[in-house]
């Protein structure tokens, strides 16, 4: 009763059990509490993958030594180690052994088991000198920390390996159907129609990336420096083809961050007998959370408002499209035609660019208007039919002439009459 009154008074004065008792109360059979002297008799060492429990044989602090064989760790009856010391008993077990249970909390992994003291009667007598006791054992490991006693030593990936990993990005440029759902199977288009182009990058295991079309130049051959040429996209993402009498533009919004779609009015090169077109575009990616700027943008020219508008970001990033001064360190191919205008390894010079590549779609066949093609086809068919008719007439005339000539010759041949004598 004295302990109960003291505990009640402490609770009223201090307002909590933690202030009243610095150690947990161990409950014996019958519910009788005893002060936490057992904690000073039991020591637990939590290692990286195991725990070590050291128990004083004077478990209850009464001077009465317990027997080592009366102690077990966990319900699996893990026995103590053999020790030459007479005053302590030691257990050593893996974290998953001796009935250890693991509990995951918000900030820790808690492994718990119990140390059991089950006294046996004194040999030859039916009496006990000590009480039964259950001592909870816990090991707590922070979830956000280093479990090992050694410091973490990071291994940096070599630069060549990093580059190889980045180069696993796969860029593509495809000619699409009008609904953007499937790739167009036929490469043929006519003047007055629209070519639907889709640039895309397969990011694989990379973090989310945002794709940009830096520039695009069509040529009559796969050589991107060939002549004649025409510029569709320039100045790091300005679709300058929309400045001419066309409705070429980027599609808003994007279908995905790693995809960019744009339309181009079909054209052909003047004074060129070739109808094939190869479109080479320089594609690049940046982190998806990076804000578009003058070097990374997708801008279209709005003919109705006579202004530039971006696919995403602030409209100010498109302000340089009119002047062509978009932070480029070299002259644009739109300003001066030359082989060196396509920079190589630009990702090494601009740190904010993760990766980039030149991709080509073609050959695309851009013909005249479909109606013109129909007229030309009808004229060509008529000419073919006329030539065929004249040829047949000539053959018939020659055949008739040969027949007449043969008949004439047969009429002028003399006949010989043979008379037989009687």
Curated annotation (Swiss-Prot):
Classification via SMART domains: ZP
BP GO annotations: binding of sperm to zona pellucida; blastocyst formation; egg coat formation; humoral immune response mediated by circulating immunoglobulin; negative regulation of binding of sperm to zona pellucida; negative regulation of DNA-templated transcription; oocyte development; positive regulation of acrosomal vesicle exocytosis
S-S bridge residues: 46-139, 78-98, 216-281, 238-299
Extracellular-facing ranges: 23-386
tRNA-binding among keywords: no
Transmembrane segments: 387-407
Propeptide boundaries: 350-422
UniProt modification remark: Proteolytically cleaved before the transmembrane segment to yield the secreted ectodomain incorporated in the zona pellucida.
Mode of membrane association: Single-pass type I membrane protein
One annotated GO molecular function: receptor ligand activity
PROSITE patterns: ZP_1 (PS00682), ZP_2 (PS51034)
Signal peptide residues on this chain, from the entry's feature table: 1-22
Keywords from the UniProt entry: Cell membrane, Cleavage on pair of basic residues, Disulfide bond, Extracellular matrix, Fertilization, Glycoprotein, Membrane, Pyrrolidone carboxylic acid, Receptor, Secreted, Signal, Transmembrane, Transmembrane helix
Family that this chain belongs to: Belongs to the ZP domain family. ZPC subfamily.
Domain remarks: The ZP domain is involved in the polymerization of the ZP proteins to form the zona pellucida.
Protein name per its UniProtKB record: Zona pellucida sperm-binding protein 3
Gene behind the chain: ZP3
């Amino acid at each position: 009763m004295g302990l109960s009154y003291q505990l009640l008074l402490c609770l009223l004065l201090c307002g909590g059990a933690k202030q009243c008792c610095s150690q947990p109360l161990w409950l014996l059979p019958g519910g009788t509490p005893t002060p936490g002297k057992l904690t000073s008799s039991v020591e637990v060492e939590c290692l990286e993958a195991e725990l070590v429990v050291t128990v004083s044989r004077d478990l209850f602090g009464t001077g009465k030594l317990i027997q080592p064989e009366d102690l077990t760790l966990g319900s699996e009856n893990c026995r103590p180690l053999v020790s030459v010391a007479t005053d302590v008993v030691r257990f050593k077990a893996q974290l998953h052994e001796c009935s250890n249970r693991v509990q995951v909390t918000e900030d820790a992994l808690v492994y718990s088991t119990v140390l059991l003291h089950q006294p046996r009667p004194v040999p030859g007598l039916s009496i006990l000198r000590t009480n039964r006791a259950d001592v909870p054992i816990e090991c707590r490991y922070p979830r956000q920390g280093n479990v090992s006693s050694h410091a973490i030593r990071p291994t940096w990936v070599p630069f060549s390996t990093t580059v190889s990993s980045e180069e696993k990005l796969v860029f593509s440029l495809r000619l699409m159907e009008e609904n953007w759902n499937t790739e167009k199977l036929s490469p043929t288009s006519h003047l007055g129609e629209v070519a639907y182009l889709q640039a895309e990058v397969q990011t694989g295991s990379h973090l989310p990336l945002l794709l940009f079309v830096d520039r695009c130049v069509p040529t009559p051959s796969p050589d991107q420096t060939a002549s004649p040429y025409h510029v569709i996209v320039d100045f790091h993402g300005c679709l300058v083809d929309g400045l001419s009498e066309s409705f070429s533009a980027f599609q808003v919004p994007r279908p995905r961050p790693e995809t960019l779609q744009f339309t181009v009015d079909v054209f052909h090169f003047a004074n060129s007998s070739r109808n094939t077109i190869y479109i080479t575009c320089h594609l690049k990616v940046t982190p998806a959370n990076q804000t578009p700027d003058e070097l990374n943008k997708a801008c279209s020219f709005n003919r109705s408002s006579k202004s530039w508008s971006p696919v995403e970001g602030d409209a100010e990033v498109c302000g340089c499209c009119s002047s062509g001064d978009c932070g480029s360190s070299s002259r644009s191919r739109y300003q001066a035609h030359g082989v060196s205008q396509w920079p190589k390894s630009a990702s090494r010079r601009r740190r904010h660019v993760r990766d980039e590549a030149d991709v080509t779609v073609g050959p695309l066949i851009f013909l005249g208007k479909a109606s013109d093609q129909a007229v030309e086809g009808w004229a060509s068919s008529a000419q073919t039919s006329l030539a065929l008719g004249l040829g047949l007439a000539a053959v018939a005339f020659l055949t008739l002439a040969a027949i007449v000539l043969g008949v004439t010759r047969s009429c002028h041949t003399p006949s010989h009459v043979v008379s037989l004598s009687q």
